[in-house]
Amino acid sequence: MPNNLQHQEGSYSLRSSNDVSPADDWTQTNDPKEKKRIQNRVAQRTYRNRIRARLEELENKIRCHEKASKQDGNENEDRASEKAMAQDFLITDQALQSLTLPRRVSSAGLSQEPATPPDLLLPSFFHQQQVKIPSAADELNQPKPPSSPPAWAEGQLNVAPRAAQARSIAPTSTGMHQISPSYGPPVFLPTEDLSIDIISSRGLSSSWKTAADLTVQGTHPLPAFPSCSLANIESPSPASSQATDPMDMTFHTATEANTAILPGHRSSLDERLEYVLERAEQVGFDNFDSLVTAYYSETFHGSSRLASEQRLSRNRRLPRVIAEIFRAASHWSAWERGGMNQEVIKSAECLLISEGTAARNALEGSLSLLVDGGNGSGDASSVERLVQNEIPNLWALMTSLASGTHSPRQQDRSGTALAAIMLLYFSGSMPKEQLLRLLIICLPDPVSPQKNN
């Protein structure tokens, strides 16, 4: 039985690549998307085959039950005369109604394993639990309760009018009455001190026989019969009870398929990144770019771990990420890197303009005092320090640009960068004579070749 269970549990998992056709062998392709499509196609085909086989099995069971019910109907017609004899016997035995102690009934003739499905249900005082036979057709056919209460409570013996649908009771030569069910061996009860109340009930389908309630009374206590307990009723095997829920199979198939394609740390970079992109879309992000944007731009709770990671990443990891991306962009096509370069230039423009707007007034007043107060190298150093403190980003940019076009005759290009900044900021807002004196201070004298020699 455990081997069967293990086989059944694994029957809904993704089939091995050795069991599929060459067209469905996902190990022969390197494309992750194509591999996933092949695996999903194989899993769906396997699931449909399992459902189709299960439906055929259920249809066969229903046909067997219908055939058995038709045969049982023919047997009931033959036993109609025997039912009449049993009714006469029960009516003449009315004196037993006053007895309160049930008579012990021998279980020697009872079958230990009644066949399924039974057409006779014993009442609750005959055994402590209601006998219920689980089967695959229970969902389609549920028996209704008896149409009328028995005459047991009114002190009368009653035999239901549908005696043809109950079990046959016939006297035997040994003084015992035989109850002949349609399934299983006969059951013998003593002829003395016997009262039976048979109640017919209707089922929802012709595949089930009419149920009857059997009440036995006598002068001795009635023990619990092994054949009447739930433990001895034939029930579906564990394998059949766990096998056939289509929704359950769908869930296991989808889960196992997703688990089978879950990439690990040894998987290729393409598979891992594709998995991350899919998970980001599943949790509500439009794409991976929106996830990264939200991580760096949103404001999280100050004491959360996410906020701490965000602050560290902004200061340490994000600059390296931008540098690596810009370095890798040199290998992109012109169309791919065009948009990024434009955004970099726009961002630099916004940064430098906002920096210069805030420092313009302070620079103009300080530089006017320096120009009017004197000249010389000392004044140039003062102007350079002032510019570095007020507009550091523009100073770094202009110095880098000037150093990239340096002349072998002039090693220090800071004066050129400083003069360019003065022209950029104060051309048109400062008097021309004052601006020329400022440029003379900023630009150093060129070194002649004779002096170098």
UniProtKB/Swiss-Prot annotation:
Biased composition, class Polar residues, residue ranges: 1-30, 170-181
Domain bZIP: 30-62
GO annotations of cellular component type: nucleus
Gene Ontology MF term list: DNA binding; DNA-binding transcription factor activity
Disruption outcome: Completely abolishes the production of radicicol.
Record carries keyword Iron: no
Keywords of the record: DNA-binding, Nucleus, Transcription, Transcription regulation
Region (Leucine-zipper): 51-58
Gene3D superfamilies assigned: 1.20.5.170
Region (Basic motif): 33-50
InterPro entries (alphabetical): bZIP (IPR004827), bZIP_sf (IPR046347), Sec_Metab_Biosynth_Reg (IPR052635)
Name the record gives this protein: Transcription factor radR
Species name: Floropilus chiversii (Chaetomium chiversii)
